[in-house]
């Protein structure tokens, strides 16, 4: 934010979808759903494919870019139509050979840890 980059943060909606809003100042983040800081309603909404990079949270990631998240499927639903590059961040000790996955689970394209960058899927 200090460098003037356009950064969009997620908002979790009651219908279990996610939207993103541009944040220009940390004071625009307010504690909301699940106790997570989200942009306030004054922030401009960002169209889903107006950005090229998505950082995806996860508890653990596997070699194929699948993850265990927090169980609501927000990011899996969003990733199903996202056209940019998705990145998972985790410590190497949280990278497993394989994690359980369901039919709606989506993988990230790249996993980054303190030990390196792993391109696990060809970017879309």
Language-model regions, residue ranges each:
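N-terminal active-site beta-alpha-beta segment that forms phosphate/nucleotide-binding
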Residues: 1-53
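Surface-exposed, charge/polar-rich loops and edge strands
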Residues: 49-54, 62-66, 76-124
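Short, well-ordered strand-loop elements centered on a beta-strand within folded domains, enriched
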Residues: 15-21, 66-68, 117
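Short linear motifs at secondary-structure transitions and domain/linker junctions
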Residues: 10-12, 28-35, 61-67, 85-89
């Amino acid at each position: 934010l200090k460098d003037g980059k356009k950064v969009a943060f997620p908002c979790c909606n009651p219908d279990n979808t996610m939207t993103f809003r541009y944040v220009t100042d940390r004071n625009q983040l307010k504690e909301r759903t699940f106790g997570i800081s989200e942009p306030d309603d004054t922030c401009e909404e960002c169209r889903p494919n107006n950005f090229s990079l998505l950082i995806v949270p996860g508890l653990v990631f596997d070699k194929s870019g699948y993850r265990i998240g927090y169980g609501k499927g927000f990011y899996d639903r969003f990733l199903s139509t996202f056209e940019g590059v998705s990145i998972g961040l985790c410590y190497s000790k949280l990278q497993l050979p394989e994690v359980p996955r369901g039919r709606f689970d989506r993988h990230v394209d790249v996993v980054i840890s303190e030990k390196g960058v792993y391109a696990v899927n060809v970017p879309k």
